[in-house]
């Protein structure tokens, strides 16, 4: 049995079990990290090589999407074959691959916006806005410091036209819909 088949089977079984128990499962890190040079939390990380090297990873993501995973988290690394300028969590191109090519219509959660590889020299506020603009619905920030400033930056970005109001409304609607779907389903006893 190939590694991708084994990973798919285990991942799908885990997702089904977790979601049957009333928890929203999240598949990560899209589009896969078959090789990174550095730890993305503390250094800039890039996954080099042609898009074909991601085929096995993308097949696993197709399987977990087919199994009904409710959320996917784009990773912190840059994938030059898809988008040479943005980390996966702030890349509209990576998120388009997830949505358009793989047909994922669920919740997209950014990876930790405090990660050096996601920040890429930008402020946390700008990175949060970039992630939403790229198509994330929910932002992960590992510390509570600066949450008010992030919220203010998002409001300012909408006011200034940097972030479309409709994008923010769609993100909040998606988060509420997924949360509501979990509340309406009974938990396994």
Tell me the role of every PLM-derived stretch.
Residues 1-6, 14, 181-189:
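Proteins with a high burden of low-complexity, intrinsically disordered sequence enriched in S/T/G/P/A and R
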Residues 156-187:
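Mid-to-C-terminal alpha-helical segments outside catalytic/metal-binding sites
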